[in-house]
Amino acid sequence: MNKQISKKPAQRTIALNKKALHDYYVEQRFEAGLVLEGWEVKSIRAGRVQLRDSYVVFKGGEAWLIGAHLSPLPNVAEYMKADPQRSRKLLLNKPEIGKLFGAVQKQGLTVVPLDLHWHKNHVKVEIALAKGKKTHDKRETIKRREWEREKHRVLKSHG
């Protein structure tokens, strides 16, 4: 018997930024590579990553991920100065950087990371052009989500 091999790209999620989906309306998503050091890759493999308060800034025509926390493993060499909060360069094409930068400058949008995942053997970050939610919008989203959950619960019990 032959086993079917799926043609889907292997994509395993490492870390999610749930706060970004709560605080922003996502307009458009992009996938970017990250410039990492060796100890950072090991920390990512161990799952020691947090994207909660991170965001993207543009300096000198390049995109940088700020505020992502990668905790170093306890066995990182002592001669290295492991900085868990350092700025990490994002690898994007020039047209993508131009589009993101233009939207941030002209429309007042924000670029936030949504998740960190493996794509084949590379660490990728999914970033999004996003518009901030007001407090009443956040409450409305929560009400809508709870109503959907309650509706499914009732249909399941009576169905």
From Swiss-Prot:
Keyword Cytoplasm: yes
Keyword terms: Cytoplasm, RNA-binding
InterPro entries recorded: SmpB (IPR023620), SsrA-bd_prot (IPR000037), SsrA-bd_prot_CS (IPR020081)
Disulfide topology: none
Localization in the cell: Cytoplasm
Listed GO MF terms: RNA binding
GO-annotated biological processes: trans-translation
Keyword Chaperone: no
SUPFAM superfamilies, alphabetized: Small protein B (SmpB) (SSF74982)
GO CC terms in record: cytosol
Alphabetized Gene3D superfamilies for the sequence: 2.40.280.10
Location, primary (coarse class): cytoplasm
Function: Required for rescue of stalled ribosomes mediated by trans-translation. Binds to transfer-messenger RNA (tmRNA), required for stable association of tmRNA with ribosomes. tmRNA and SmpB together mimic tRNA shape, replacing the anticodon stem-loop with SmpB. tmRNA is encoded by the ssrA gene; the 2 termini fold to resemble tRNA(Ala) and it encodes a 'tag peptide', a short internal open reading frame. During trans-translation Ala-aminoacylated tmRNA acts like a tRNA, entering the A-site of stalled ribosomes, displacing the stalled mRNA.
HAMAP family, sorted: SmpB (MF_00023)
Protein family: Belongs to the SmpB family.
This protein's name: SsrA-binding protein
Species the sequence originates in: Coxiella burnetii (strain RSA 331 / Henzerling II)
Phylogenetic placement of the source organism: Bacteria, Pseudomonadati, Pseudomonadota, Gammaproteobacteria, Legionellales
